[in-house]
Amino acid sequence: MAMHQFKAESKKLMDLMINSIYTNRDIFLRELISNASDACDKRYFKSLTDTSIGITKDDLKIHIQPDKEARTLTITDNGIGMTKEDLEKNLGTIAKSGSLDFKTENQSDNIDIIGQFGVGFYSAFMVAQKVTVISRAQGADTAWKWESKGVEGYTITEADKDDVGTEIILVLKDDTDSENYSEYLDDYTIANLVKKYSDYIRFPITMYREKSRQKPKPEDAGDDYKPEYETYTELETLNSMVPIWKRPKSEVKDEDYNEFYKNKFMDYSDPLRVITSRTEGTATYTALLFVPGRTPYDYYTKEYEKGLALYASGVMIMEKCADLLPDYFSFIKGVVDSEDLSLNISRETLQKDSQLKLIRNSLEKKIKNELHAMLVNDREKYETFWKSFGRQIKFGIYGDYGMHKDLLGDLLMFYSAKEQKMVTLDEYIEKMSEGQKCIYFAAGDDTDRLGKLPNAQLVLSKGYDLLLCTEDVDEFCLQMMHDYKEKEFKNINAGDLGLETEEEKKAAEETANENKDLFEEIKKALNGKVKEVKVNPTLQEHPVTLSSEGGISMEMEKVLRKMPGSGDVESTKVLELNPNHTVFAALKAAHEAGDTAKVDQYAELLYDQSLLIAGLPIEDPVAYAQLVCGLMK
């Protein structure tokens, strides 16, 4: 009998599970029951198209049998069963899931990596010193036995088993001073675990339970008769078998929803919001959806898979149906059960299924309305949600070229320079000053720096509010929207803000005409770094600022240059000088004196300063430092 070895990472994970102590090791039973339920689902699904199988849904079941004397716990199902190849494939290799890295990064946290990463069957080794799996597949003539004591490997041999299905026998570990493994042989403990973790399983989970009853009173018993009791065993169904999403809402507590969410979607935090939906008509379905309370560790990576568990008349046909959710709501978890979907539907035909599209559209509206209700009625929770998933909403607007701005626009939040807190676009508009035509915003990586920008101080001095956008996607999102409720978005560092008085405009035109040659000399000194040099009389105490023209702003340039393959993306820059500042007077004096070298030095200095103010890197920091020192002599 040959001993097969687990593969390298499988061995590490196995060792991790066997030798680590988890406060929630109870989940091993949940995992084994879930696997048994999946096997029953598969056999039932197959029976719908293969009448030779000859079973109904009522024939399928899961049975648990504890044996205190033998110290074994046996979980049996009459599901689809496994062939020798299935045993080798499913039980001989633990899929690489990143759980080792995750556990290493969270040394101090009591995190259930098994629940987090769905290692499933192997959680049995948390409580068992030996695991035996005896299985006979549907349509197979031979049964097979898989057996392992852990990291050293496993064996697969022929076995005797007449019925289709799988039997898993756990030989429990011996008790220690600190660990009581015998509790998993107690029928009360087992019943509680099934109720807690597996009550929604669709198939009956049965177990013989020891009970007590009073013996019949003898006919000749005297007045001094004392009742006598006897113990007996009775087969009991431990689970309700009604999925939580099909129960009347009045019968389900918040704690039930939270527990279902955490068990089903492998999270250790309660959801922020539970969304229930029952719809009849053109699209008949039941949905139970959740807004997670935290960002999944892989959410903003390519590895993250969106989708809802899709059931057809109670039979799961897809674990993650991506077509039920638009990308901007990809954070939503949940299940959808519809009687209108065909049981033998494939992934390919699913995409073209008209019922699925109707369900998706209905869910989209429902999710949007629930998020907006959370914004209105529970602001604190909504702001928690926004910190985790607001970026995805903004990506949704940008990625669809603004097509969904009407749907998503009133969910957006940005930091207000005036209010010093997060505000919605509706709240911004509601407090707009009389005569204000635009929604002003500044984009960058830090709210403090943005609030000190020359044009930011100008906008605020007019009594207008300013949205401080600090995420990479913010400006792209607002540019795609263009406006909100007929109020145009205006980047304070892109183009003319139009905030000058008529007198300031007239004075600026006169100054520009008087200093045309000076501006040409500055532009020449900067050698193509700016498209134009002009005066800006609204800069107050600031000598200079940098603005941009065209579709790409300076902040967008920064973002795009971080992306691979972006090439030499560059914004069109305009150098704006304050005609009322002493620096401008010094520039003008040097020009009138014919000191071209000094004008060139001032031009370089002011340009580099404007880059620093805008949060952009200067081309040559050493040359800049030398220039500053030289002008100080």
Report the location of each language-model feature.
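GHKL (Bergerat-fold) ATPase N-terminal catalytic module, capturing the glycine-rich phosphate-binding loop
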Residues: 1-187, 192, 215
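GHKL/Bergerat-fold ATPase module in large chromosome/replication-associated machines
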Residues: 113, 134-153, 173-183, 188-633
